[in-house]
């Protein structure tokens, strides 16, 4: 991490003008994020779960939501509201991604409610429908399937009912192994 910080600092000192994007699981220590202050223009964290039961089961991190809440607060403190250039390109801000998982739309609604009630229009919320069950999902029959359109739409409509207007949604069939990073 220190090598990346040093390289970014040097690049910015030498006139780097493109935005620096920090892609994250959301499970970050605030102390680490503070080292990046002034170097990162756009934070792109996940916010995977609100439920400690789900985060313990699927990510072995029962404290995921508490860690992610603290990390997100630091990210937003550093970047402020999302700012775009004249062509609509994001220049600074935080875009929080949430992957809606099959069978857990209530947890997704809890995530969206937390994000919107806490940050309103300071952040953009990206609701993703691309959950793809990989071979290990066979160990968890409840998530060993793709997300239905009904489940995803229910979360999207819930976000809209809260007043979320700044964000991104996915249309169509995006759950293919060919698009998994």
Name these PLM-found stretches:
Residues 85-88, 94, 134-166:
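Conserved N-terminal glycine/acidic-rich loop preference
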Residues 1-140:
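Conserved AdoMet/S-adenosylmethionine-binding subsite of the radical SAM
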């Amino acid at each position: 991490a220190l090598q990346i910080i040093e390289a970014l600092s040097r690049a910015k000192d030498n006139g780097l003008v493109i935005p620096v994007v920090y892609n994250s699981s959301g499970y970050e220590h605030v102390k680490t994020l503070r080292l990046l202050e002034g170097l990162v223009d756009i934070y792109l964290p996940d916010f995977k779960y609100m439920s400690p039961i789900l985060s313990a089961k699927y990510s072995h991190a029962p404290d995921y939501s508490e860690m992610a809440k603290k990390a997100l607060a630091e990210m937003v403190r550093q970047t402020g509201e999302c700012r775009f250039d004249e062509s609509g390109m994001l220049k600074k801000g935080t875009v929080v991604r949430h992957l809606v998982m099959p069978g857990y739309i209530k947890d997704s609604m809890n995530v969206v409610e937390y994000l919107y009630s806490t940050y309103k229009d300071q952040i953009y919320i990206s609701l993703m429908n691309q959950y793809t069950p990989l071979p290990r999902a066979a160990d968890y029959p409840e998530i060993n399937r793709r997300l239905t359109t009904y489940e995803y739409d229910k979360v999207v409509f819930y976000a809209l009912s809260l007043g979320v207007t700044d964000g991104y949604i996915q249309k169509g069939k995006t759950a293919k192994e060919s698009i998994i990073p």
